[in-house]
A protein has these predicted regions:
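Short loop segments at secondary-structure junctions
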Residues: 17-20, 40-41, 132-135
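Alpha/beta catalytic cores of group-transfer enzymes, especially the acyltransferase/condensing modules
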Residues: 1-32, 118-120, 128
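Glycine-rich, charge-dense phosphate/pyrophosphate-binding loop(s)
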Residues: 75-173
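Short acidic, glycine/serine/threonine-rich loops at helix termini
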Residues: 10, 18, 48, 169-172
Length: 173
């Protein structure tokens, strides 16, 4: 559901529960764009899960919960400053970065180019950056792509408005 819900519904979704399934669409600012860069490497979800810790510190759990709450409030309010402060993954990113060559340089390039925040998309290897406006998103996508190219890693870059509609039929012929 964590991958299917956003694809079907579009934008951001919060899965509050899996049993029973409780999916909540979350509004976001009209000018929020995402730059997605997919490096030409294979990364199995099982390998990405294997590097995660089975236990987290109490402080990291509290901080991650606060970041998640801040992220959701920032989306709903359109508060880019809060969004920037809330885009810190303390649970997965510190361990999964080792699986994506050049990730730290890529993230730095994204932030330097104007991204609100940058992280690993799902279990990777794709990297996403949230940006205020399409122009900045295209600049960020270019900066990330160049950072991957610099270490010899081919990649594909995509830019999309975040609150785009979900899956829909555009032509039924």
């Amino acid at each position: 559901a964590d991958n299917v819900a956003p694809a079907l519904l579009g934008g951001f979704t919060l899965i509050r529960s899996y049993n029973p399934l409780d999916i909540i669409p979350v509004s976001c600012p009209d000018d929020l764009y995402s730059a997605i860069i997919h490096p030409d490497i294979e990364l199995n979800t099982s390998d990405a899960r294997r590097v995660l810790k089975t236990e987290v510190s109490f402080q990291n759990a509290i901080s991650q919960s606060a970041n998640t709450a801040g992220f959701m409030v920032a989306l709903i309010r359109g508060d880019y400053d809060l969004l920037k402060r809330s885009m810190s993954d303390l649970l997965a990113e510190p361990y999964r970065t080792q699986l994506i060559p050049g990730f730290d340089a890529v993230k730095n390039a994204a932030l330097k180019a104007g991204a609100v925040g940058c992280g690993i998309s799902g279990s990777g290897p794709s990297v996403f950056a949230l940006c205020q406006g399409e122009t900045i998103a295209r600049q960020v996508a270019d900066a990330i792509s160049k950072a991957f190219n610099k270490i010899g890693l081919l990649n594909e870059a995509f830019v999309s408005k975040v609150n785009a509609p979900g899956t829909r039929v555009t032509d039924y012929r």
